[in-house]
């Protein structure tokens, strides 16, 4: 796949223009490798749904056995801690309902480690970050 650096699209709100993209990473509690097969696919669907409900745009995503990478776009009104909480909290609740076997490995009731990493993305770094996220499974 060829990646070309393109100017990022400016989005418009009422009285402002913006371009906010983030690379968000978080891990499964205790780094247990439980996000595989249909569980990983289900998580992708759940995260896309939660993102849409919260006005976030998922640009690309990769679910690894013990962590998640998201490249997403947000609006200036969306506080980072709020949308991270929405993504992690709602996804954990929905995953435990959809895949009750997760509770066997994650006996404490938490799917996610409480911490996360978030990085800003610019038009100079977007293609590189997108390539990095999409190539995660190649590294296994």
From Swiss-Prot:
Mg(2+) binds at residues 67, 69, 136. Disruption phenotype: When tested in an R1 strain with only a single IS200 element (DR_1651 and DR_1652), required for transposition of the IS element; single tnpA or double tnpA-tnpB deletions leads to loss of transposition. InterPro entries: Transposase_17, Transposase_17_sf. Keywords: DNA recombination, DNA-binding, Endonuclease, Hydrolase, Magnesium, Metal-binding, Nuclease, Stress response, Transposable element, Transposition. GO terms for biological process: DNA transposition. Disulfide bonds: none annotated. The active site is at 132 (nucleophile). It holds the Pfam family Y1_Tnp. Mg(2+), Mn(2+) and Cd(2+) support DNA cleavage whereas Ca(2+) and Zn(2+) do not. Changing residue 14 to A: 60-fold decrease in excision frequency, 30-fold decrease in DNA binding. Its cofactor is Mg(2+). SMART domains: Y1_Tnp. Residues 127-133 are annotated as: Mobile alpha helix. Induction: Transposition of this element is induced approximately 100-fold by 10 kGy gamma irradiation and approximately 50-fold by 600 J/m(2) of UV irradiation, both of which damage DNA. It rarely transposes without irradiation. Both excision and insertion of ISDra2 are increased by irradiation, transposition occurs in irradiated cells, probably triggered by single-stranded DNA formed during genome reassembly, and is not due to specific induction of TnpA expression. GO terms for molecular function: DNA binding; endonuclease activity; metal ion binding; transposase activity. The record marks 14 as: Critical for recognizing and stabilizing G:T mismatch in DNA substrate. Both the excision and insertion steps are inhibited by TnpB. Belongs to the IS200/IS605 insertion sequence (IS) element family, formerly called IS8301. This element is subject to strain polymorphism; in the ATCC 13939 / R1 strain genome sequenced by White there are 7 complete and 1 incomplete IS200/IS605 elements. Another R1 strain has only 1 copy of this element. Another group found 2 copies of this element in untreated R1 strains. Homodimer. A transposase that is part of insertion sequence (IS) element ISDra2, it is necessary and sufficient for both transposon excision and insertion of ISDra2. This protein alone can be provided in trans and allows transposition of an empty IS element (tnpA or tnpA-tnpB replaced by a selectable marker). ISDra2 binds subterminal imperfect palindromes at the left (LE) and right (RE) ends of the element and cleaves only the 'top strand' which is circularized and subsequently reinserted into the DNA target. This is called a 'peel and paste' mechanism and increases the copy number of the IS. Belongs to the transposase 17 family. PANTHER family: TRANSPOSASE FOR INSERTION SEQUENCE ELEMENT IS200 (PTHR33360:SF2). The helix containing the catalytic Tyr-132 (residues 127-133) is highly mobile. Recognition of the 5-base sequence immediately preceding the cleavage site is mediated by base-pairing to an imperfect palindrome, by sandwiching the fifth nucleotide between Tyr-30 and Trp-107 and hydrogen bonding to His-32, and by main chain atoms of Leu-106 and Trp-107. This is ISDra2 transposase TnpA.
């Amino acid at each position: 796949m060829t990646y070309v650096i393109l100017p990022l699209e400016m989005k418009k709100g009422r009285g402002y223009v913006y371009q906010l993209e983030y690379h968000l990473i978080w891990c499964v509690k205790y780094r247990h490798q439980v996000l595989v097969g249909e569980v990983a696919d289900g998580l992708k669907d759940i995260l896309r749904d939660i993102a849409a409900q919260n006005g976030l745009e998922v640009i690309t995503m990769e679910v690894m056995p013990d962590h998640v990478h998201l490249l997403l776009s947000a609006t200036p009104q969306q506080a980072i801690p709020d949308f991270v909480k929405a993504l992690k909290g709602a996804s954990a609740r929905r995953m435990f309902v959809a895949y009750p076997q997760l509770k066997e490995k994650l006996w404490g009731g938490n799917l996610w480690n409480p911490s996360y990493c978030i990085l800003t993305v610019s038009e100079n770094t977007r293609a590189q970050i997108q390539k990095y996220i999409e190539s995660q499974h190649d590294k296994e």
